Amino acid sequence: MAKLSLRNVQKTYAGGTQVVHGIDMEIADGEFIVIVGPSGCGKSTLLRMVAGLETITGGEIHIGDKVVNDLEPAARDIAMVFQNYALYPHMSVYDNMAYGLKIRGMSKGEIEQRVKHAAGILELASLLDRKPRALSGGQRQRVAMGRAIVREPSVFLFDEPLSNLDAKLRVQMRLELKDLHRRLKTTSLYVTHDQVEAMTLADRMMVLNGGRVEQIGTPLEVYARPASTFVAGFIGSPPMNLVPVARNGSGQGVAQMRVQPKDGQAAATLGHLPMGLHLPEQALMGLRPEHIEPCAVHEAIAELDVRVVEALGADSFAYGSLGGQPIVVRLDSQTQVRAGDKLPITASAEHLHFFDVQSGKRIEAQA
């Protein structure tokens, strides 16, 4: 195991197109880091640079105390698990897992010990004689992981390893990956576009957008205090509501703002905001659907014009608008709302977020 350091890491292709912009991160020995972002944000490129499959055009990558920029992949003491299993179809599970060790000239006894140990961890012991065609998708992915585990690397690299699995298998494999890391405690770098994988697997996560770091933090930190409107809209399902607001004065310790109207709608005033804060003159106000609560009319910060209600069993989502701006609210199964209703809503101070209108960066409301 080893720590991993990314220091001002950059990637620019011929022609001047820069796809990774000066990324810095210190990853502790044994830490599980998830790089998450939309397609094309540079996350797989960054992972491939760590692996040695892409050249680095700026900065340094350290594995342990060694700068690995110019080292071949085989010399970096890493093991990589890809989205495609890349198993040899003519080889058994045992031989697929053992092949890399044979190439390295390891003794037969050591190979057998490592393969059987990994097979035990991954519940593959009864499948070692089977060919890949006789395995399910989840079993094939476990073989691919086993092939990485037997190398006993300093760092595991995962490039969207669950993307080819169906929804049920992805849930199962997420749990198995979490348990696997708990037991092995190997430094891991995991790439995904799936925020659920990021939230459930990561010790810390890096949110990438356009090759730049938007935020690094624990899943709870990123969820509770998004650093930008991009993070607020990317992490969370449904994403955070973002509403343009303008200051409307304050008095007696209670702030007021109005929603900037859309499509000729009348402005909606947000009254009784539960805080006496110096708020910006204009901002984007963020509020997660699960942090908006129905309430009595006299306690409401606003009334939502309900347009559509989706009932999902344990809870439901009410889609509506304030001043023409779209808002979604998560409701429990006991709250009965129908399309066309006006729903009085409120929210507590700690769940209100404000972002700069121009930059999208988080701003703190000052007491």
UniProtKB/Swiss-Prot annotation:
UniProt entry tagged with the keyword Cell membrane: yes
GO-annotated biological processes: carbohydrate transport; glycerophosphodiester transmembrane transport
Keyword Cell inner membrane attributed: yes
Amino acids binding ATP: 37-44
GO molecular function, one term: ATP hydrolysis activity
Residue intervals of the ABC transporter domain: 4-235
GO cellular component terms, A-Z: ATP-binding cassette (ABC) transporter complex, substrate-binding subunit-containing
EC number: 7.6.2.10
Taxonomy, superkingdom: Bacteria
SUPFAM superfamilies documented for this protein: MOP-like, P-loop containing nucleoside triphosphate hydrolases
Keyword terms, alphabetized: ATP-binding, Cell inner membrane, Cell membrane, Membrane, Nucleotide-binding, Sugar transport, Translocase, Transport
InterPro entries: AAA+_ATPase, ABC_transporter-like_ATP-bd, ABC_transporter-like_CS, ABC_transpr_MalK-like, ABC_transpr_MalK/UgpC-like, Mo/tungstate-bd_C_term_dom, NA-bd_OB-fold, P-loop_NTPase
CDD domains, sorted: ABC_MalK_N
Known catalytic reactions: sn-glycerol 3-phosphate(out) + ATP + H2O = sn-glycerol 3-phosphate(in) + ADP + phosphate + H(+)
Record's bilayer topology term: Peripheral membrane protein
Function: Part of the ABC transporter complex UgpBAEC involved in sn-glycerol-3-phosphate (G3P) import. Responsible for energy coupling to the transport system.
Subunit structure: The complex is composed of two ATP-binding proteins (UgpC), two transmembrane proteins (UgpA and UgpE) and a solute-binding protein (UgpB).
Family of this protein: Belongs to the ABC transporter superfamily. sn-glycerol-3-phosphate importer (TC 3.A.1.1.3) family.
Protein name: sn-glycerol-3-phosphate import ATP-binding protein UgpC
Organism this protein belongs to: Cupriavidus metallidurans (strain ATCC 43123 / DSM 2839 / NBRC 102507 / CH34)
Gene it is expressed from: ugpC
